[in-house]
Amino acid sequence: MKQLTETQQLKELIAQYRSEGRTIGFVPTMGFLHEGHLTLVEKASKENDIVVMSIFVNPTQFGPGEDYEAYPRDLKRDARLAEQAGADVLFTPSPSDMYKGEQNVAVQVKRRTDVLCGASRVGHFDGVATVLTKFFNLVKPTRAYFGLKDAQQAAVVDGLIEDFFMDIELVAVDTVREEDGLAKSSRNVYLTEQERKEAPMIYKALQQGAELIRDGERNPETVIKTVTDIIENTSGVIDYAELYAYPELTPLKTLNGKVILACAVQFSKARLIDNIIIDIDEWERS
């Protein structure tokens, strides 16, 4: 596995790969890798000639009160895991390399960001879209891989690729979970022992909501109340529990088509997100 830190190094290597006609799979991350990230690398490795993983804790997507400096980092461990999973190139640029002085241009996301996590993290997805535009221009991937645990991010990336006519296939991969259903996340390390026991209730609540929809419930408020009633039995504080059309993330008075049931729960030192995406039309046909 090649490890690169400078954008010029990466540009030269990508130019070589493209001249050889190789397909490139790209897995962007902020590091502190877990099985969810590695699943993306493994899938990318099966579907492309070359896999590029980036590790970059992006300062522009951290909002007020979010501690950029405290985000967990362990590059030596991450490099070992990335190589074992099948990454061919690990790109770990510095903030000064990705953001050279004052920016002339930044991406502003107009839709899909005023709900779910975006509602309380103003500017977050602008930072995500800006850095991904930079990465996409550097890596020039055939396919880009994102986990559906952050389904709002995947929806924003879908819009970014579509609106800017990027010749990139977005591959959205199902959430990887612990045996008890908790979505794997770098933030799980911040849970206390008691909170770790309670956290799987988030996914259980979403499953109950999805089951209601499967059984014919089409009122969003009824489904959401079922979810919140279950989560309120934990010590976590619900940030949101919401239902929208997916990937448009627009509200629905009556549930139909593809929808996302999503929630965020704040524990003492960890804010956990999770979701279930439900294709109602597909369920009704089966």
UniProtKB/Swiss-Prot annotation:
Subcellular location: Cytoplasm
Predominant cellular place of this UniProt entry's protein: cytoplasm
Binding residue positions for ATP: 30-37, 147-150, 176, 184-187
Disulfide topology: none
Catalytic residues as annotated in Swiss-Prot or TrEMBL: 37 (proton donor)
GO BP term, pick one: pantothenate biosynthetic process
Binding site for (R)-pantoate: 61, 153
Keywords recorded for this protein, A-Z: ATP-binding, Cytoplasm, Ligase, Nucleotide-binding, Pantothenate biosynthesis
Reactions catalysed according to its record: (R)-pantoate + beta-alanine + ATP = (R)-pantothenate + AMP + diphosphate + H(+)
SUPFAM superfamilies: Nucleotidylyl transferase (SSF52374)
InterPro entries: Cyt_trans-like, Pantoate_ligase, Pantoate_ligase_C, Rossmann-like_a/b/a_fold
GO MF, one example: pantoate-beta-alanine ligase activity
Annotated GO CC locations: cytosol
Positions that bind beta-alanine: 61
Pathway given in the UniProt record: Cofactor biosynthesis; (R)-pantothenate biosynthesis; (R)-pantothenate from (R)-pantoate and beta-alanine: step 1/1
EC number: 6.3.2.1
Described function: Catalyzes the condensation of pantoate with beta-alanine in an ATP-dependent reaction via a pantoyl-adenylate intermediate.
Subunit relationships: Homodimer.
Note: The reaction proceeds by a bi uni uni bi ping pong mechanism.
Family: Belongs to the pantothenate synthetase family.
Protein name in the entry: Pantothenate synthetase
Organism placement in taxonomy: Bacteria, Bacillati, Bacillota, Bacilli, Bacillales
